[in-house]
Swiss-Prot record:
Converts internalized glutamate to GABA and increases the internal pH. Involved in glutamate-dependent acid resistance in gastric fluid. It comes from Listeria innocua serovar 6a (strain ATCC BAA-680 / CLIP 11262). The gene is gadB. Its cofactor is pyridoxal 5'-phosphate. It catalyses: L-glutamate + H(+) = 4-aminobutanoate + CO2. Signal peptide: none annotated. NCBIfam families: Glu-decarb-GAD. It is an enzyme of class 4 (lyase). This is Glutamate decarboxylase beta. Keywords: Decarboxylase, Lyase, Pyridoxal phosphate. Coiled coil: none annotated. Belongs to the group II decarboxylase family. The lineage of its organism: Bacteria, Bacillati, Bacillota, Bacilli, Bacillales. One of its GO terms (molecular function) is glutamate decarboxylase activity.
Length: 464
């Protein structure tokens, strides 16, 4: 978010009963004198008093709970700079282990040399995956004699994309070719995708967990379509899987879904460690099936144990604590631990979906049976005067942050509401939410609703 002119309140109120009580403390300039640590702590703490509870935030995919031991370990390693491989070689080794664990989880072929790196989140990971596709496409196209300056290269993706892909296309001058979703295709329409592909296509993005609804693109079917396409042309097109949400969930709960490096044309995958990898924000990961898919000019060398280590990141200095937190989780939970946690989360999501459906007011778009996301709209014949925006507002009064928003272009007339179920949302908390949900509906049914005839569609709450 960009900030500009400060608000009217120029000064913080002095701390009660403290030595600073006799002077004002400026907000937007540095104070002349230092404060006691206790006073500075209390001032900042009080500034955050009226924010929502992270545990009650059903809008965010980001992890809002970690074990005390994990939090302690991360707080003890905040000073470690992840980029300083020579100074912190054991930290570099833990990152290497994480990449190997993820490669194994995503079935990287044993006869190829996978590569991967940590990032500050899936947005950076998507940028890196997109950059690799662009540079690799350019190299292939030049070799085949294509005039790469005749038109902009393009990226094909469904309209359910996360905003980071739009940023990538703007920042790196790529034409985004969007395959629209419709009522019959609430994910990538693989029957239409080849209509958007040509010799200037750097790649196709398949999404394992669409932000709007939680649904999966059919990566297997997409692979089949591109295999057919690639068999007829020298201008090969490959798949990057944006598995920000599903990359650390699907392998444990639905291992039979084939979406990863087992597919011939899937060459790179990103995920968020701070979503279903169960780490606090922000940590992401991106892997390439083989080093041949990662152009050498994007790789930089850093000093490491008297030698050099290849790195590829947009950001530079950052704390290694989240990498260490990710390794802690891998060590702590193992495969069965992750599976148990995610299955419980899935059960909670399906419980919530059933309770929502039982009210009789809603059509369920996603029932949490895959990714633990509950998504629904008001029935056309619901015969109520209130909207999902009203319901979101009423729930917020009870502390729950639940977004309501229109679907992407071509479906923007459909307003939906979504819950993201995370590991810290247990059945007891879910039951409390349903009680508040039902009470909110009852209050709205008894309320005198005004002005909806002129209300414009918008967004209530944070949707990504």
């Amino acid at each position: 978010m960009l900030y500009s002119k400060e608000n009217k309140e120029s000064y913080l109120e002095p701390v009660f009963g403290s030595s600073a009580e006799d002077r004002d403390i400026p907000k937007y300039t540095l104070a002349k004198e230092p404060l006691e640590p206790r006073i500075a702590y209390r001032l900042v703490k009080d500034e955050l008093l009226d924010e929502g509870s992270a545990r009650q935030n059903l809008a965010t995919f980001c992890q809002t709970y970690m074990e005390d031991e994990a939090t302690k370990l991360m707080s003890e390693t905040l000073e470690k700079n992840a980029i300083d491989k020579s100074e912190y070689p054991r930290t570099a080794e833990l990152e290497n282990r994480c990449v190997n664990i993820i490669a194994d989880l995503w079935h990287a072929p044993k006869d190829q040399k996978f590569m991967g790196t940590s990032t500050i989140g899936s947005s950076e990971a998507c940028m890196l995956g997109g950059m690799a596709m662009k540079f690799a496409w350019r190299k292939r196209a030049e070799k085949l004699g294509l005039d790469i300056y005749a038109q902009k290269p393009n990226l094909v993706i469904s309209s359910g994309y996360q905003v980071c892909w739009e940023k990538f296309c703007v920042y790196w001058d790529i034409d985004m070719r969007v395959v629209p979703m419709d009522k019959d295709h609430m994910q990538l329409n693989t029957d239409q995708v080849l209509d958007y592909v040509d010799e200037y296509t750097i790649g196709v993005v398949g999404i394992l967990g669409i932000t709007y609804t939680g649904r999966y693109d059919d990566i297997y079917a997409l692979n089949e379509k591109l295999e057919e396409y690639n068999s007829k042309t020298d201008y090969k097109v490959y798949i990057h899987v944006d598995a920000a949400s599903g990359g650390f969930f699907t392998p444990f709960v639905e291992p039979d879904i084939i979406w990863d490096f087992r597919l011939k044309n899937v060459i790179s995958i990103n995920t968020s460690g701070h979503k279903y990898g169960l780490v606090y924000p922000g940590i992401g990961w991106v892997l390439w099936k083989d080093e041949s898919y990662l152009p050498e000019e994007l790789i930089f060398k850093v000093s490491y144990l008297g030698g050099e280590m290849p790195t590829m990141q947009i950001n530079f200095s950052r704390s290694a604590s989240h990498i260490i937190g990710q390794y802690y989780n891998f060590l702590r939970y193992g495969f069965e631990g992750y599976r148990t946690i995610h299955q419980k989360t899935s059960d909670v999501a399906q419980y919530l979906a059933h309770a929502v459906e039982q009210t009789g007011y809603f059509d369920i778009y996603n029932d949490g049976s895959h990714l633990p996301i509950v998504c629904y709209k008001l029935k056309d014949d619901a015969n109520v005067k209130w909207t999902l925006y009203d319901l979101a507002d009423r729930l917020q009064m009870r502390g729950w942050q639940v977004p309501a928003y229109p679907l992407p272009k071509n479906l923007e007339n459909i307003i939906i509401q979504r819950y993201v179920c995370r590991a810290d949302l247990g059945f007891n908390m879910a039951e409390e939410f349903i009680q508040d949900f039902q009470a909110s509906i009852q209050e709205l049914n008894n309320a005198h609703i005004l002005f909806h005839d002129t209300q414009q569609s918008g967004v209530h709450g944070f949707t990504h």
